[in-house]
Amino acid sequence: ITMNTLNQQYEEKVRPCIDLIDSLRSLGVEKDLALPAIAVIGDQSSGKSSVLEALSGVALPRGSGIVTRCPLELKMKRRQEGEEWYGKISYQDCEKEIEDPADVEKKIRDAQDEMAGVGVGISDDLISLEIASPDVPDLTLIDLPGIARVAVKGQPENIGDQIKRLIQKFIKRQETISLVVVPCNVDIATTEALKMAQEVDPDGERTLGILTKPDLVDKGTEETVVDIVHNEVIPLKKGYMIVRCRGQKDITDKVSLTEAIEREKAFFNDHVHFQTLYNDGHATVPKLAEKLTLELVHHIE
């Protein structure tokens, strides 16, 4: 099932809101009027890019180390069944249409190299990627660089602070919903991304947690993960979702995004511990897409 499960009524309510926000943002109204946005943050290797990739249906730059080197605004617009896929990338004074979904990753890498320098720096400038297709939800997300603990060769010593400063700039605004991506195989309480979200949003009013990599969960900690998603460990007003996206092996094995959604559903459906989360509507990427769209609308209202 693609995103077509999103109710028509939200389609009618959501689309006008999102179009309005996008056009205001492109007119530069941002400066005087704070527009609602969803910012995606996570420690490095949290599975952030995989979540965005699953939502957008296109491959984004991924790998170890700093992959997202500039803020990437991902504008997704849902098209009618049968309509063509459309893509466009804009940054600085440059705007290019993208013919083929397979070219997106390279175009983003080129744009990042142009803006942040080839290699290892980061930049505050926004790259905007617009995608229209029958298979995406109506959503605009801003992907921010992963939080790095230590600088690698060639990076400025203070790269960690630079990234934090950049993230802070986005998430401290009251209009921003922070999407905090945390893998199931780490202790959520120690993740830097959640700490940062808590600093700017102590009551968890506008923070939503996403747990990734449930297939890598340490044996014996599954029930803790269930408790986290049930909002019983670190409560957030917007709660938690759990997803399983393509890992490196799936990509090597050429598992398509559509196939990955089927596999994800089967994974949760058959999982002794996580099945309840699936039944409660707390699991899978399509459910996440639905929740994000609703959250954005509530936030706008």
UniProtKB/Swiss-Prot annotation:
Show the segment(s) annotated as G2 motif.
67-69
Write out the residues that bind GTP.
42-49, 143-147, 212-215
Name what induces it: By interferons.
Q: Which residues form a coiled coil?
A: none
For this UniProt entry, the molecular function terms from Gene Ontology, in alphabetical order, are:
GTP binding; GTPase activity; microtubule binding
Q: Where is this region: G1 motif?
A: 42-49
Subcellular location, record wording = Cytoplasm
One of the record's GO cellular component terms? nucleus
Any Gene Ontology biological process:
synaptic vesicle budding from presynaptic endocytic zone membrane
Domain (Dynamin-type G) ranges? 32-301
Q: Where is this region: G3 motif?
A: 143-146
Identify the Pfam families for this entry: Dynamin_M, Dynamin_N
The record's listing under InterPro entries reads: Dynamin, Dynamin_GTPase, Dynamin_GTPase_CS, Dynamin_N, Dynamin_stalk, G_DYNAMIN_dom, P-loop_NTPase
Which parts of the sequence are annotated with region: G5 motif?
A: 244-247
Q: Which CDD domains match?
A: DLP_1
Q: What is its main location?
A: cytoplasm
The alphabetized UniProt keywords are:
Cytoplasm, GTP-binding, Nucleotide-binding
Q: Which residue ranges are recorded for the region named G4 motif?
A: 212-215
Q: Does the keyword ATP-binding apply?
A: no
Family membership, please give it: Belongs to the TRAFAC class dynamin-like GTPase superfamily. Dynamin/Fzo/YdjA family.
Q: What is this protein called?
A: Interferon-induced GTP-binding protein Mx
Native source organism of the sequence: Perca fluviatilis (European perch)
**Gene expressing this chain:** mx
